[in-house]
Structures are given as structure tokens and as C-alpha cells.
A protein has these predicted regions:
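Beta1-alpha1 glycine-rich phosphate/pyrophosphate-binding loop at the start
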Residues: 1-3, 31-39, 70-138, 164-171, ...
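Ferredoxin-type iron-sulfur electron-transfer modules in oxidoreductases and energy-metabolism complexes
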Residues: 1-16, 33-62, 187
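Glycine-rich dinucleotide-binding loop and its adjacent helix/turn
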Residues: 45-62, 123-140, 163-226, 335-347, ...
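Feature captures the FAD/FMN-dependent oxidoreductase FAD-binding
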Residues: 62-71, 119-168, 267-280, 285-288, ...
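Glycine-rich Rossmann-fold phosphate-binding loop(s) that bind the pyrophosphate
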Residues: 71-75, 211-213, 361
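FAD-site-proximal beta/loop scaffold in flavoenzymes
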Residues: 172-204, 289-366
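Long hydrophobic segments that form regular secondary structure
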Residues: 200-237, 299-300, 305-311, 317-318, ...
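A conserved FAD-binding loop/helix module that cradles the flavin
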Residues: 219, 362-388
């Protein structure tokens, strides 16, 4: 009960959050004795509670006649639904995928977050009164206008799904893949679901993954499990400046992934058939800090070389995808395509359309699971205030 007071998905955060650079990194015992393993504790407590039959106590809830449509069954949408139903507001969640979780289910591999975790959470949320409309894409299977008309409020928890690119020539060549389609296709295979796209198989291939975050680690470790012949992760800064979890880097190394640091991709090499056969790199040295305080990677003259590869995965992160179906409703976006929904206002995370709220990656940009959960919960509180519940 205590862990659920501030977190709608503690069993997930205990598994996927980079605790080493968050809570455990700030632990006062870290220097001398090693940090308290907060993630493992969070995971154990929640798993044990589920094993013992725990479920949220909804006996005190007085149901109102209010109902809210939630677009997106990822961490922000699920967190919003959790808070709403606990306060007697009907929550109906719409999502284009066949299972809940969004990227928790389809983007994070099963070796890091077991698929049964979200299946169990769907059962719990359903018993709490959350209704799920899966395989339902807004703008295609149901129109936003219908949701705005039929519900007292709408929450947008649609995440960020557009892959960032490096701006290299030949990025669309055969053998070059974006991280998310690769990970999603693998999940459909693992879950034995009918995939809308072909399975991307790295078996027997020389794989180079570009990027240094947790998504890159998911890609290299998935490639290993698909029996790639060789897997290399190339990152433009040094190891100390990698944004990903230290634990994930350690796991990848132990599984056979090779790391090459201070390498910046400058081109893709193709054979006569147009298929990728290598990545051209230039070595880098770290220069002056950028606006975020991280030292800039600067190219070293005369250090160009080619690394052989017949599969290249781009794992540079995600940015907001186009949402044309929002345009007629006066929902403003910022210059990066993120939904404007400030947390500090009368109704938290309300957009420029008073009936529509938003939170998570669609508002702040690609970030951690725990921040999406937090914003989903706070947006739900804003909705409750708006509905005067």
C-alpha cells in the first residue's frame, strides 16, 4: 500500500529505472558500503504482495457519473487511470496495441521487463474499474471528436515514437534499422502475436548499434539473443558520459557486446547492390561543455575509418511524432512538437483546449518511465480539480 501511494507501477520502476544514477546514486551509504538496493527492494515488495494476493482496496470508493477518455496505455496513461478510478471517475483507455504498457510492453525487451508483469497489471487495473479498448487507434478507429463529445475530459498519454536520426547519407538503405521497429518486431515474435510488420532478425549478422542510452543497450542485448555473429555498440563520447544505466552496460558486456567509445558516425558504406556493409567513423576527443554541461565530442582530424557491418541499428532516442488529429482542437505544440501542458497552473497539465489534458513524454520529450508515471498521476489530479470531484 505504501509503495502505491506515490507510484502506480512500482514493480516496473523496480526493474527498469536507472537507479544507479537516480535514488541509489544519491544514497548516503554509496561511498563506503554500497547503496541500499532500492530498485530490488521495490521489486521484491510488490512481487511478494502480488504473490500473496494483494489488490488495491476499492471498497471506500464512491463512484461519480464522470468519465474520462485516456489515449495511450503507456505509463502516463495507466498512472492517470489509476488515480481517476481511485477517486470514483470512470477511466476508459484507448490504445493501438493489442496489450497495455505501450513501450513498456513493446519497446522494452522481456529480459529486462517480463511480459507477464503488464499482463498482471492489466488484470489489477481492470478489477479496479479501468476499461481498456485495445487495438483502437485514435484518428483511425475512433475520432478524437467523438471522445471529446462523449467524455467529461480527455487525457493524452501518447508518448514519443519518432526515431531520431544522425543525418547520414544512405540512412534508408537495406540493412539500416531504427531502434523502435526492431525492438517492437522482436516483442511481437516473443509474445507470439501477429505482427503488422516483418520480423527483423539479426541472426548471423555483424551488428553495429549507434547510441549510448538504455535503448541502445536493449538493441545490443536483443541482437545477442537473436544470435548475431558480432555485436558492437559505438558511442561518440567516453564511457563515463554514457547516458544509459551502468548496470545495463555491465550486462551487455557480460553477454558479449563489444563497446567502442569516442567514435562518431559520419557515413554508411554500401555494396554494389545498395546494402549496408559498414559504418564510417571519425574518432572524437571531448572538448568544452555544451548547454547541458556535457563535454562536446570534437572530431580528430585524419582518424576516419570504416567498421564492417551488415546490420546497423540507430538508437539515438525518440522525439514527438506527428499528431495531425490534434490540430482541429486547438491543442498547441511547442517548437519541438511537444504538447503544451504546464504542470504549474490552476489545472495541472491542462492543454490549450480546456477539456484536454496531457502528460509524459508527449509533453516533456523522451524521458524516464518514472517521470511519465508522475506526470500521469499529477494530470489526473488536475482532471479531478477540473471536474470538481
Amino acid at each position: 500500500e505504501l509503495s502505491h501511494q506515490t507510484n502506480s507501477l512500482p514493480e516496473v520502476c523496480g526493474r527498469v529505472c536507472p537507479q544507479d544514477r537516480l535514488c541509489e546514486g544519491s544514497c548516503t551509504l554509496n561511498d563506503d558500503f554500497g547503496a541500499v538496493t532500492i530498485g530490488n527492494i521495490e521489486k521484491y515488495i510488490t512481487d511478494k504482495a502480488f504473490e500473496m494476493g494483494w489488490k488495491p482496496d476499492m471498497s471506500h470508493v464512491e463512484w461519480t457519473d464522470k468519465k474520462v477518455a485516456i489515449i495511450g496505455a503507456g505509463p502516463a496513461g495507466l498512472a492517470a487511470a489509476d488515480i481517476l478510478v481511485r477517486n470514483g471517475v470512470k477511466a476508459v483507455v484507448f490504445d493501438r496495441y493489442p496489450e497495455i504498457g505501450g513501450l513498456l510492453t513493446f519497446g522494452i525487451p522481456s529480459f529486462k521487463l517480463e511480459k507477464g508483469i503488464m499482463e498482471n497489471r492489466r488484470r489489477i487495473f481492470s478489477e479496479m474499474g479501468v476499461e481498456f479498448q485495445m487495438n483502437t487507434e485514435v484518428g483511425k478507429d475512433v475520432q478524437l471528436q467523438q471522445l471529446v463529445d462523449d467524455y467529461d475530459a480527455v487525457f493524452l498519454g501518447v508518448g514519443t515514437y519518432k526515431n531520431m536520426r544522425a543525418g547520414l547519407d544512405n540512412e534508408d538503405a537495406p540493412g539500416v534499422y531504427d531502434a523502435l521497429p526492431f525492438l517492437i518486431s522482436n516483442t511481437y515474435k516473443v509474445m507470439d502475436l501477429e505482427s503488422p510488420t516483418p520480423f527483423i532478425n539479426m541472426q548471423g549478422k555483424k551488428v553495429v548499434v549507434l547510441g549510448g542510452g538504455d535503448t541502445a543497450m536493449d538493441c545490443v542485448r536483443t541482437s545477442i539473443r537473436q544470435h548475431a555473429a558480432n555485436v558492437v555498440c559505438a558511442y561518440r563520447r567516453d564511457e563515463a558520459n554514457m547516458p544509459g544505466s551502468r548496470r545495463e552496460v555491465k550486462n551487455a558486456r557480460e553477454e558479449g557486446v563489444k563497446f567502442k567509445f569516442n567514435l562518431q558516425p559520419i557515413g554508411l558504406e554500401l555494396n554494389s547492390a545498395g546494402h549496408v556493409v559498414g559504418v564510417k567513423f571519425v574518432k572524437t576527443a571531448l572538448g568544452e561543455p555544451d548547454e547541458a554541461g556535457r563535454r562536446r565530442p570534437e572530431p580528430v582530424e585524419g582518424s576516419e575509418h570504416v567498421l564492417e557491418a551488415d546490420a546497423v541499428i540507430m538508437a539515438f532516442g525518440f522525439q514527438p511524432h506527428a499528431m495531425e488529429w490534434l490540430e482541429p482542437f486547438g491543442v498547441e505544440l511547442d517548437q519541438w512538437g511537444r504538447i503544451k501542458a504546464p504542470g504549474q497552473q490552476e489545472f495541472q497539465y491542462q492543454t490549450t483546449n480546456s477539456k484536454i489534458f496531457a502528460g509524459g513524454d508527449a509533453v516533456r520529450g523522451s524521458d524516464l518511465v518514472v517521470t511519465a508515471i508522475d506526470e500521469g498521476r499529477k494530470a489526473a489530479e488536475g482532471i479531478l480539480d477540473y471536474l470538481e470531484v
